[in-house]
A protein has these predicted regions:
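Hydrophobic positions on the alpha1 helix immediately C-terminal to the Walker A/P-loop
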Residues: 18, 22
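Conserved nucleotide-sensing/catalytic segment adjacent to the nucleotide-binding pocket
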Residues: 31-34, 40-88, 103
């Protein structure tokens, strides 16, 4: 059974960066899963409606698929992680195969929100950064 670490925090708090740093310490023994890959596919609604979606709400994420993928990895079964296009609000097949590994690092805004996912986590981290710093980071990141 792998060790699963959940990393949460506000947008721009450094979740992804921290997850990648942990992974770099164990490159052959770890897998990173990004919650952002699991945003709901909105291809069934018009683009103007999709643009109004609040992605900073747990309902924007298909957490049942994320939970299923975590369970598969927990059982030693590889999965194909989705990807998400913020241009057309669609989930894409990424070809990104996640292999079972001794360490699974799950990062995202809401990974501590859902009990069924939270109960799979061996370690739960919340990165607390002041809102001004997070906003600066988010603007820098999102306007590249």
């Amino acid at each position: 059974m792998p060790i699963i670490i959940g990393i949460s925090g506000g947008s721009g708090s450094g979740k992804s960066r921290f997850a990648r740093r942990v992974q770099s310490a164990f490159p052959e023994e770890s897998t990173v899963i990004e919650q952002d890959w699991y945003y709901r596919d909105l291809s069934g609604i018009n683009l103007e409606q999709a643009k109004k979606t609040n992605f900073d709400h747990p309902n924007a994420v298909e957490h049942t698929l994320l939970h299923h993928h975590l369970n598969c990895l927990n059982q030693g079964i590889e999965v194909e992680a989705p990807d998400y296009s913020y241009i057309n609000y669609r989930r894409l097949l990424s070809g990104n195969i996640l292999f079972p590994s001794p360490l699974i690092i799950l990062e995202g805004l809401f990974v501590l929100c859902w009990p069924e996912i939270r109960n799979l986590l061996h370690f739960k981290l919340y990165i607390n950064v002041d809102s001004e710093t997070r906003l600066e980071r988010r603007l820098k990141r999102d306007t590249k």
